[in-house]
A protein has these predicted regions:
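Extreme N-terminal starter segment of soluble prokaryotic enzymes
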Residues: 2-6
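Short, glycine-rich nucleotide/cofactor-binding loops
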Residues: 7-20, 36, 42, 47-52, ...
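Walker A/P-loop phosphate-binding motif and the immediately C-terminal alpha-helix
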Residues: 22-31
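Short internal beta-strands
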Residues: 35-42, 92-96
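Short, hinge-like loop/turn segments at secondary-structure boundaries
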Residues: 54-58, 110-112
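A glycine-rich helix N-cap at a beta->alpha junction
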Residues: 56-94
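C-terminal binding/interaction regions
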Residues: 102
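Glycine-rich, aromatic-bearing surface loops/beta-hairpins
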Residues: 108, 117-135
Length: 135
């Protein structure tokens, strides 16, 4: 039976390295055949917003194509694809209360709405839990 890792993250996209670090940990766990639960709350519910768009960098004079600005929605979508390829589970819950406060409900495919009871259950059932707070 595969091991399970639960990660709780609250850092919004593009604010610090915390969300990127969380996604790298998730990626590494999935590649090792570990099931991963993600509980996104506070600003982290914006990591999966479908309406994110790459942008040019007018300071450097680069176009969207030249800038190749990644979006967190693409990173999260690639994690769901990786889980599928590896035959492991990625369960991503966006805190419904946090989503409602922010109007952040238009997500890519994969994440689902939930709340603290899922996190509580996951912490009890997981082999390890990592909490990545915001500053």
């Amino acid at each position: 039976m595969p091991k399970t890792l639960t990660i709780s993250i609250m850092e919004p996209p593009y604010e610090s390295a915390a969300s990127t670090t969380a996604m790298r940990i998730i990626d590494a766990a999935l590649r090792k055949g570990i099931n991963v639960n993600v509980f996104a709350y506070e600003g982290a519910v914006s990591l999966t917003i479908k309406d994110q768009k790459p942008h040019p960098n007018p300071v450097h004079g680069t176009s969207v194509e030249e800038e190749k600005h990644p979006t967190t929605k693409e990173f999260v979508a690639s994690l769901f694809e990786l889980a599928k390829e590896k035959g492991v589970k990625l369960d991503w819950v966006n805190c419904g209360l946090c989503v409602d406060e922010r109007g952040a409900g238009n997500w890519i495919d994969g994440p689902r709405r939930g709340g603290p009871p899922e996190l509580h259950k996951w912490v009890q059932e997981s082999d390890a839990t990592i909490v990545i707070p915001t500053k």
